Amino acid sequence: MAGALKATIADSRGMNVLLILNDGPYGTERSYNGLRLALSLAKTTDTSVRVFLMADAVACAKTGQTTPEGYYNIGRMLKGLTSKGIEIGTCGSCMDARGYSDADLDAGICRSSMAQLAAWTLEADKVVTF
């Protein structure tokens, strides 16, 4: 089984992957699991990863998140991705609807748009939605 997994990962090099997150940072683990996948994909050679936050997932990009000790921190996970050069966009309309401004976003995360999501989707070899 492990050999098959390694072969699959080796075959996926050179791919462009877009992850779209929809759920808020805490409550369900969908965004958490999407970011876990993004971090794992970021470790593979020649794989380009982008993350787009929309709907309640725009709250994942909120600066200054504090969680109890031992609990996962979505903000830290996003910082781990941006430190690797991974592009993270947030739906501007979704931000506006929830009262978020650009100043609310962690460093390296940018307000984006449906036009940007459309472009990223067309450039992606695979799109995964959480």
Please tell me what each predicted stretch does.
Residues 2-14:
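Short, Lys/Arg-enriched N-terminal segments with co-localized hydrophobic residues
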Residues 18-32, 61-66:
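Short, glycine-rich nucleotide/cofactor-binding loops
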Residues 38, 48-55, 88-92:
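Short internal beta-strands
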Residues 97-130:
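C-terminal structural segments of small proteins and small subunits
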